[in-house]
Amino acid sequence: MNLILLGAPGAGKGTQAEIICAKMNIPSISTGNILRAAVKEGTEMGLKAKSFMDAGALVPDEVIIGILKERLAQDDCANGFILDGVPRTIAQAEAIETMGIRIDKVLELSVADDVIVERMSGRRVCEKCGASYHIINKKSKVEGVCDLCGGKTVIRKDDQPATVLDRLKAYHEQTEPLVAFYRERGKLAVIPFCPSIEETTAEVMKALEA
C-alpha cells in the first residue's frame, strides 16, 4: 500500500509512520533523509540538488520529486511505502501524479493548534546526550536534569511557542490545501485526535482496512 501522512508539525506523524512501517513491513520515506542520501550517493538528481543547496537556494519541486522517484524504484518499496513530509504543496502533489507515482491512501492526523503548541512547547532535550523529555507526560526525575547523563535539559528553538506558531501558520498556508486536493480524489482518511499513541494507531489501522 502506498501511503501519504499529512498533519501539522507535532501531530505525531513520525511516531505513527514508525508503527505502520513495523506492522506493514514497508519503509517510511522523508524528504530530508532522501535528499541527504541522494547527495551522499552522488545520484543524478542528488548532484542537481547539491548545486542548489551549495548556493543556499531551495531545492526545486521537480528535483525533490525526481529524487523521490529514484528512491521509490528501490526494492524495499515493492510492497508499498509511507511518504512523510512530501508532498508539502499542491505543486508537489501534482508533480507526483504527473510522474505516475500511485498513491492509495492519504491519512491526515487531525490535531488542534492549541494541543500542538502545548505538546511541542513542553518538549525538553538534554544538551549533552540528546535524550528527550516532556514536562507533562515524560518528566525527568529532577526538573531540568537528564536522567541518563545528568546534563541540562533545554527547550529547542523549534519547540518555543512563537516558533511553533510560525510553523503552524506555514503548514496551514502551504500544506493544508492538500487535504482538499486528496479529498477530491477520494483518497483522504481523516484520523481524529486521540489522547494516546495506541488509540491513534487503532484509528489509523481502521482507516487502512476501510
Segments from the language model and where they lie:
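Glycine-rich phosphate-binding loop of ATP-dependent small-molecule kinases
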Residues: 1-210
